A protein has these predicted regions:
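Membrane-embedded alpha-helical bundles of polytopic integral membrane proteins
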Residues: 1-128, 132
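Interfacial loop-to-transmembrane junctions
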Residues: 146-169
């Protein structure tokens, strides 16, 4: 909930149109409703594991992009966020696929048969898509921060840019 508060504050700094801000607020409420509805539905069978794997894939995406981008560097990905590189984007995808797959296999070994997750081509594609969406989320928040002329979205996590920066993927 705190990240949505930070997101709405960011929008308030950029846009002055009350109608636009109302529409954004409506979509935040709608998103929260569907997100929590999904959580309730996922609790039926293996929902916690699915949510955990989604969160882990976003974490691996962020870590992979940062580590590979810093180590290899190379051409910039976009002017929206000048520290993002093409090598970082590829590292993000690789870390997501390898890290999340390893975590899911570990989770399956720890809790025998808890999730029937067999690594397949479809899961491979889904992990790539997850990484790409995580990177887009990061770029969108970077764009909004640049437009609002702020470095961090909040101060609850010093050095991390705020809650929104941690979960933007």
């Amino acid at each position: 909930l705190l990240c949505f508060y930070e997101f709405y504050n960011l929008i308030n700094k950029i846009y002055k149109n009350i109608i636009f801000k109302t529409i954004v607020f409506f979509f935040i409420v709608l998103y929260l409703y569907f997100f929590y509805s999904l959580l309730i539905r996922l609790r039926i069978e293996f929902g916690e594991e699915v949510i955990l794997i989604l969160l882990i894939s976003c974490i691996f995406s962020d870590i992979g992009g940062y580590v590979v981008g810093k180590l290899i560097g190379g051409p910039k990905l976009t002017s929206i966020s000048p520290n993002k590189t093409i090598s970082g984007a590829l590292g993000s995808i690789i870390f997501t696929v390898i890290g999340t797959s390893s975590f899911a296999l570990f989770l399956n070994k720890v809790d025998e048969g808890l999730i029937k997750l067999e690594f397949s081509f479809i899961i491979f594609i889904w992990l790539i898509i997850m990484s790409i969406f995580c990177q887009f989320g990061d770029l969108i928040v970077s764009y909004l921060k640049r437009k609002a002329n702020v470095k961090d979205t909040g101060n609850l996590l010093p050095g991390h840019g705020g809650i929104l920066d941690r979960v933007d993927g």
